[in-house]
């Protein structure tokens, strides 16, 4: 009779242990599956790897609600500056399903693969995307930069 109680208590203990483990796994599972947010790196390879692009505000800081000038630097994957590129710019807020409030343009080639982008404006806080369609001697490619305010 004592051995039956021993097995019963051992079984209950094992059941409690497994229930505790399952509770921890259940509570932690949502955290494991959560996205960490958009990639906000300022330098990256283009979609097909033809170019390495970097993007930064000319004034050094992102300002909400102000018309800004940014610098886009384009290099080949071998590191040579990309000269004479045609650049089309679009974008918007993916979570709000609207485009940019302005029409940014590549206005000047500054040398060493650097292009001035004028007319960038972020009217509200949140996640913004800027899409660059690049056409140059090396070919055509795209790159997308995320900006979170």
Per-segment meaning from a language model:
Residues 1-3:
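N-terminal secretory signal peptides that target proteins for export/translocation
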Residues 5-15, 20-129, 133-149:
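Contiguous segments within soluble domain cores/interaction surfaces
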């Amino acid at each position: 009779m004592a051995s039956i109680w021993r097995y019963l208590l051992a079984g209950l203990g094992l059941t409690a242990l497994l229930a505790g483990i399952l509770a921890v796994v259940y509570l932690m599972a949502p955290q494991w599956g959560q996205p960490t947010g958009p990639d906000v790196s300022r330098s990256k390879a283009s979609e097909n790897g033809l170019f390495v692009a970097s993007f930064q505000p000319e004034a050094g800081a992102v300002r909400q609600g102000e018309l800004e000038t940014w610098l886009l630097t384009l290099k080949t994957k071998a590191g040579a500056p990309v000269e004479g590129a045609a650049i089309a710019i679009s974008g918007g807020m993916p979570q709000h399903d609207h485009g940019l409030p302005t029409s940014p343009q590549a206005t000047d080639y500054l040398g060493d693969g650097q292009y001035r982008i004028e007319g960038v404006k972020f009217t509200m806080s949140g996640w913004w995307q800027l899409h660059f369609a690049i056409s140059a001697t090396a070919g055509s490619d795209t790159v997308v930069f995320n900006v979170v305010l």
